[in-house]
Structure formats: C-alpha cells, structure tokens
UniProtKB/Swiss-Prot annotation:
Monomer. GO terms for molecular function: tRNA (guanine(37)-N1)-methyltransferase activity. It comes from Heterostelium pallidum (strain ATCC 26659 / Pp 5 / PN500). S-adenosyl-L-methionine binds at residues 203, 242-243, 269-270, 292. This is tRNA (guanine(37)-N(1))-methyltransferase. Keywords: Cytoplasm, Methyltransferase, Mitochondrion, Nucleus, S-adenosyl-L-methionine, Transferase, tRNA processing. Specifically methylates the N1 position of guanosine-37 in various cytoplasmic and mitochondrial tRNAs. Methylation is not dependent on the nature of the nucleoside 5' of the target nucleoside. This is the first step in the biosynthesis of wybutosine (yW), a modified base adjacent to the anticodon of tRNAs and required for accurate decoding. It catalyses: guanosine(37) in tRNA + S-adenosyl-L-methionine = N(1)-methylguanosine(37) in tRNA + S-adenosyl-L-homocysteine + H(+). It is found in: Mitochondrion matrix; Nucleus; Cytoplasm. It is an enzyme of class 2 (transferase). It comes from the Eukaryota. The gene is trmt5. InterPro entries: MeTrfase_TRM5/TYW2 (IPR030382), SAM-dependent_MTases_sf (IPR029063), TRM5-TYW2-like_MTfase (IPR056743), TRM5/TYW2-like_N (IPR056744), tRNA_Gua_MeTrfase_euk (IPR025792). Its main location: mitochondrion.
Amino acid sequence: MSSLLLNKEIFSKSISIVGLKVNKTLLKTLAQEFKGYLLIRDRVKHIVDDSDSKDKKLVLLSESIENGNVGAYGVNKQLPDNLQSFLKTHSIEVVKHQVQLNYNNFSYEEVMKELIPTGLPIPHAFEKIGHIAHLNLKEELLPYKNMIGQVILDKKGPQIRTVLNKVGKIDTVFRTFNFELLAGDNDLLAQVVYWNSRLQFEHSNLIQTFKSHDIVVDMFAGVGPFAVPASKLVKCKVYANDLNPNSVKYMRENATRNKASTIEISNLDARDFVRELVSRDPPVAFTQAIMNLPSTSIEFLDVFREIFLNPEKAPPIPAPTIHCYTFTPVSETAGGDLKELTIKNVEAIIKHPLPADTTVYEVRDVSPNKRMMRISFKMPTLKKRKDTENNDDQENNNNSSNNNNNNKIDYNEAVSSGGEGKKIKH
C-alpha cells in the first residue's frame, strides 16, 4: 500500500495579529497584565520591533483576539475591562500586524488535524524505547503512515530519531515484533530486545508486595523490569531467566549498572529453568514466581502441576505464590466474568481448583476485544496420608482392602492456603 508523503509547503501562510505599540519602559508591566492574552506559537516571538519607532516594541496578542477598531486607543471588546482601561490609561495604540508562518510554527496536533481527514483518529499514544518511537497504526491510517512518522520525528524530537510501525502480530518465540521504518535513522538496536514501557507501573505494583525474605523466580524476565528492582529495592534473592540471549545480555548489564547483586541469571527454556531449580541439592525454596509472557504464560503452568501435584516428584519445599499474566478475550466472557474466566483457564491447565484467596487483576486494555490480566494464587499441592490403624483395628475389619491403604496418597485432598473454591478477592 503506497503512503502519502508530507508536503510542508501547505503550512506556509500569513496571519493577521492584533499588536500593541508599547514604550520599552512599560513592557514588563504590560507582559504581566496581559498574561494569558499574548501570542503563543512555536518559534514565534510575541514581542517584536516596531518599524515606526525605536522607543517602542510591538506586543502581539493571541490569535483568538480579533482586530477591533485599529488605530484607536484601548478599544477591543474581546479584552476584559481592566485591560481596556490599562490601554487607555497608557495611550497604547492597537494595530494590525502580519505574521509569516511555516511548518515549524505549527504544533503536532495542528499538523495532524491538517493532514488526517476528518473522522479518522489522530495517533497520540506510542511506545518510546531510547531514541525509537514505535506505533501500532490502525488500518485506516496506513495511507498516511509516512507522513505521521515524519511529523512525530519533527515535533516530538530531538530525543526521537527513529519511528517504526508494528506490522502483523507478535508471534516470534522471543516476543519481538515485525516492523517497518516510517521515518528517521535506520538505527534499530531495540529490534532484538523489546520492553513494554507501558507496564512500568504494574512492575512497581507487584514488586511492592514482596518482602526481603522472599525468594523470587522470574521465568520470562526479559531485560529485568521485575527482577532488577526486586533485587535492588526489596533486597530479595532473585532467580531470573529468559530464553532470548539478547535479553539475558542486557539483563546482566542492567543488574550490574543498578548494583542489583542478589540476582542469578539463566538462559533456559522456562520449564527447564524451574525444573533445574527444584532439582538442586538442596532445592531452591522459592516463594514467588513471576510469569510475564501474556500470550503463552498460562501454558507453562503445567510445570508447576508436574512438580507440586505429582507426589512422586514433589520436592521437600513449600509451594510458591504464582503471579501469571495472561490475555483474556472479551468475546469469551458472554455469560461470565473476565476474572472468573481467567480462573477457569488456569484451572484447566493445572487440573486442580484454585484457592479461595486467589486474586485476579485487570492490568490494561490490549484491544477492544482483549484484556491483559494478572492472576495471583498459592500453588495447590497434594498431601500424603498415612493410615494409623493399629493391628487390632485391622483384625476387626472384614474388608481386606483396608489393609492396603497404608502410605497411599489421597488425590482428592488439596492442601492450599485457602482450600478449594473460586472466590475472587477484589
């Protein structure tokens, strides 16, 4: 699809402004009195030389103040009475003044309103990582994508040097996105590591629930937005992992720069990472597990089912509290609640009811039909039950099958902080 190019010449124009001829000695006083009524325009001064007098300056008023009774002293019905009185008292002449404008004098909003047809949304929100701005333009804006990119580069700089647009879905194993360059330098270091800056408040919210004695496992740690602050600020012991070697590289750098000294970093598949921790001698008794890969996190819960709901493999450590991020489609909630549906999706993976004190939190709208959710729960476990019947009881029991119950496992007995249930804590 071809894209229209930006023509900056259409913004070259002359506008007529109300000007006040003011003695230089009165400039400071007038500027204070007329605050809120002066010209505000990018790269245009509101005080200019008066071509008719070296002793005076021309003070330019807001574009909303129309020309009125030019040549008179202090007559303009759009000014409040006190300012009109000021003009009369000091015999200040009202004149017309022509101001030449070009593309540089217009704001981002003004340029976009001129370029984008009425009825189409003006793009305001975009992610920024370093010098790179990246957008996710809607289909109806694609014919204007290059113009939009150039305007962002011109009006949101100089810190922005590259503007990208996401193309297609995020479907790579490392959760990076396909993109196209809209404007600026082809300097794309951020293409190999992606951090979603919109979630910085969510990172803080979760980390604040941790205590210094917690042992935290971050299965999809990325560059460390959870792991590094948990180590540096809360002083937790953190085991952080990511499959993407580039993410691991920059996570190590972030940990070093921030003096986060309690992090152990791995570059493994998430399931293998957890298995390795619990297979150590002694096993790592982690208390918190973070799973921040919303598109597939929920599928990786099976590793906790494998470890804590399998009595043959269960390590001698308490079950952790799990914080799992997931996308919940709104369309699937017909006849149900977003939070209830999230709980059902998790229970389908671990094949066990969740505790009653499970909490589900809506993090943000991803799209009109999708929500990002965080579900936090204590991982259920199974408890071995030993029969304590004495020999006399066994002899009096005519059912011989009871003799085989010693040291067997009751698969129906769940041990968890809140018992079985689906109650949601809001």
